[in-house]
Design a protein with these regions (language model features):
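Small-residue-rich transmembrane alpha-helices that serve as helix-helix interface/gating elements
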Residues: 121-124, 172-187
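Conserved N-terminal alpha-helical segment that immediately precedes and caps sugar-phosphate-binding
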Residues: 44-45, 168, 190
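Membrane-embedded transport module
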Residues: 1-143, 152-162
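Membrane-helix boundary connector in multi-pass membrane proteins
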Residues: 161-173
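Transmembrane alpha-helices
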Residues: 93, 150-155, 177-184
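Mid-to-C-terminal catalytic subdomains of enzymes
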Residues: 147
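Alpha-helical transmembrane segments
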Residues: 128-132, 158, 184-195
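Membrane-interface capping segments at transmembrane-helix boundaries
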Residues: 136-139, 188-208
Length: 210
């Protein structure tokens, strides 16, 4: 009689760990890549510690805590590692491309290190929130509340507490460049997700063939 309950609890744990792991792996991946790029190519790391705290809190720490408590008894499908990487890698790659975009833009437009950091925070926050959106879909009331609250919190911190997070006011051109980058991120990430889904499909077809 207790077996269905045990199965449901097992599914809840695995499904919720998959969601939380995807969020954590985004930061781990892009931090590792950026550290290597900074070591060999870039003069400075693009973020201040307090800025990473803002991004991590709004897109990883707080949402993963509440997502882990959610009742989720859906059947576990696919490979755990591939499922996690399929959600995390597109976001991490978008963050890295965003940082490179800012650094390349700085070669053509005058930017202070503080302005570059502010641009990187906005672009990284956008990428991370889109990953959170992907992790939360399909939406339930709780997931919608989590995503909406974290987005509102991130925007509120940017608008009302810029000094605490070492964010400077951007010039008109810097604002335009940042806006263009933010507008492009959903399309770039969608491309990476589609590429990842094709990889998953090929893996399934190979398994069926065997």
């Amino acid at each position: 009689a207790s077996m269905p309950h045990i199965v449901d609890e097992g599914r809840r744990v695995i499904n919720n760990i998959q969601r939380a792991a995807s969020l954590f792996l985004v930061k781990t991946t892009f931090s590792t890549i950026l550290s290597i790029l900074t070591l060999f190519f870039m003069s400075r790391y693009p973020f201040e510690p307090i800025q990473l705290t803002l991004i991590s809190s709004c897109t990883i720490g707080i949402p993963s805590f509440f997502l882990a408590l959610e009742a989720n008894h859906a059947r576990v499908e696919g490979n755990f590692l591939i499922n996690v990487l399929g959600r995390a890698l597109p976001g991490a790659l978008c963050v890295v491309l965003s940082i490179l975009y800012v650094n390349i833009s700085s070669l053509f437009f005058q930017m202070t290190p503080a302005a570059m950091s502010a641009m990187c925070v906005l672009l990284t926050g956008t990428s991370s929130l889109i990953v959170l959106y992907r992790v939360c879909t399909p939406f339930t009331r709780k997931r919608l509340l989590i995503f909406s609250s974290m987005t509102a919190l991130f925007v509120a911190c940017i608008v009302f507490l810029p000094g605490i997070f070492s964010l400077v006011r951007l010039s008109y051109m810097q604002f335009v460049l940042t806006g263009a980058g933010m507008a492009a991120i959903p399309f770039v990430m969608d491309f990476f997700f589609r590429f990842g889904n094709r990889f998953k499909l090929k893996e399934r077809l190979l398994k069926v063939g065997k």
